[in-house]
Amino acid sequence: MKELLNDFFLILQLLTRIPVNRNLLCRRENFRRGASFMPLVGVIVGGIQWIIYKLCIIIFSLNVSIVIVILAGIVLTGALHVDGLGDMCDGFFSFKEKGKIIEIMKDSRIGTYACLAIIIDILLKYSFFCSIVPSFSLIIIIAPVMSRFSIVFIAFIGKPAKSTGSGNLFVENIGKWQLFWAAFITVITLFFLMNMNFIYVIILIFAGLFMSFLFNVFCNRKAGGLTGDLLGANNEIVEILTMVMLCVIITK
């Protein structure tokens, strides 16, 4: 139990800015086991955002409340995944060779494509939240749960693009059991949040995993594999896709 708590808090500390303030073991196996808890981190992040929405909507309009919810998500994660999306777009749309693409993604300076990607990402989230949240506010929790599970999946099927880096803590380090427990947490969580509609749960999970599979193929061609930035980019892409799927399901 002590090891499980260590691994959970390690992943929570890595993926969020929530102050854990614990001396944690940070060995490679801790990150491997901790990957199982990524969907649970999504529950925590999304849950906090959902509570913020419920409080804000009492005082503010829908538009203002959604802006605050999105801002809260960025603050909670330290813009970790959004930054990965921006770095990916700067690298991939430079149309350079693989080595140069990885070098561009490591550059701390932000480029035009990164700016555009981040703006579009936030606008899409804002638009889908405004469309769906009034009738189904639990999308605020469902989207980050599904997107964190997709990180586990793509890290399981992918290969590292470089010999060192934060992405290597998970890529080719996650085993079948970690994928199984992450899937179990995701399915159970979505099952209850989706009013026990198993068909909708399967649709969301299949869509997210299929997108991650395609994104992995794309990353192999462009960068030769996955990096930490590309894991973050996959998170954002699947989060938006989940919103698209929920928009279709809820409004049909």
From Swiss-Prot:
Q: Its GO CC terms?
A: plasma membrane
Key words of the record: Cell membrane, Cobalamin biosynthesis, Magnesium, Membrane, Transferase, Transmembrane, Transmembrane helix
Signal peptide range = none
Q: Which GO terms describe its molecular function?
A: adenosylcobinamide-GDP ribazoletransferase activity; cobalamin 5'-phosphate synthase activity
Cofactor(s) of this protein: Mg(2+)
| Membrane topology value | Multi-pass membrane protein
One biological-process term from Gene Ontology?
A: cobalamin biosynthetic process
Q: What is its EC number?
A: 2.7.8.26
Compartment(s) where it occurs, according to its Swiss-Prot or TrEMBL record = Cell membrane
Primary subcellular site in the record, as a coarse category: membrane
Extract the Pfam families matched here: CobS
UniProt enzyme class:
transferase
Where do the TM regions start and end? 34-54, 55-75, 113-133, 138-158, 174-194, 198-218, 230-250
Q: Record's InterPro entries?
A: CobS
Instruction: State the reactions this protein catalyses.
Output: alpha-ribazole + adenosylcob(III)inamide-GDP = adenosylcob(III)alamin + GMP + H(+); alpha-ribazole 5'-phosphate + adenosylcob(III)inamide-GDP = adenosylcob(III)alamin 5'-phosphate + GMP + H(+)
Pathway-wise, it operates in: Cofactor biosynthesis; adenosylcobalamin biosynthesis; adenosylcobalamin from cob(II)yrinate a,c-diamide: step 7/7
Its biological purpose: Joins adenosylcobinamide-GDP and alpha-ribazole to generate adenosylcobalamin (Ado-cobalamin). Also synthesizes adenosylcobalamin 5'-phosphate from adenosylcobinamide-GDP and alpha-ribazole 5'-phosphate.
List the NCBIfam families hit by this protein, alphabetically.
cobS
User: What's the family?
Assistant: Belongs to the CobS family.
Q: What protein is this chain from?
A: Adenosylcobinamide-GDP ribazoletransferase
Organism the protein comes from? Clostridium kluyveri (strain ATCC 8527 / DSM 555 / NBRC 12016 / NCIMB 10680 / K1)
